Amino acid sequence: GAVKQFWTDVIWGDVDYMFVDMPPGTGDVPLTVLQSLPVDGVVVVTSPQELVSLIVEKAVRMTEMMPRKVPVLALVENMSYFKCPDCDKVHHIYGESHIEEIAAAHGVDTVCRLPIDPTIARAIDAGEVEKLPCDELAAIAEKLLAL
């Protein structure tokens, strides 16, 4: 299929890290990637909704069931919370997080939470995400680079 063709027909050169952004869940694309590409680990990105947590749990279990178990390097929760810029109060707009429970159940040591932050959206839209002074993003990058 398209995933295998993408992997075999592109001259990748010398690559230290490759991130493959996939649809959530355990469908054909994630299964093909895990079975066909030389995957050393996965970073699972989620959000705090209950249904999403169930899907992520299933996807993490799928990595464990591969003939060559693929380790989950980190769980990253996107849109985890909103911190009011006026009063610093944290609001869990999409509900409470389940990321710690999933991490504990599957032995994932690295857990990161990204806030809902209009500054991040503006930086991405402007093509200037690398200039973004975001402690949460810096912490995630440092954790992943240390793996």
Go through each PLM region and give its residues.
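Conserved phosphate-donor/acceptor-positioning beta-strand/loop module used by diverse small-molecule
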Residues: 40-49, 76, 114
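Switch II (G3) loop of P-loop NTPases
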Residues: 2-32
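C-terminal lobe/tail of nucleotide-utilizing enzymes
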Residues: 64-147
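Short amphipathic alpha-helical segments
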Residues: 31-34, 56-57, 87-88
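Amphipathic alpha-helical transducer elements in NTP-driven molecular machines
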Residues: 3-4, 50-57, 96, 134-141
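ATP-dependent NMP and nucleoside kinases share a basic, alpha-helical "lid"
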Residues: 26-41, 50
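Conserved acidic residues
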Residues: 16, 40, 73
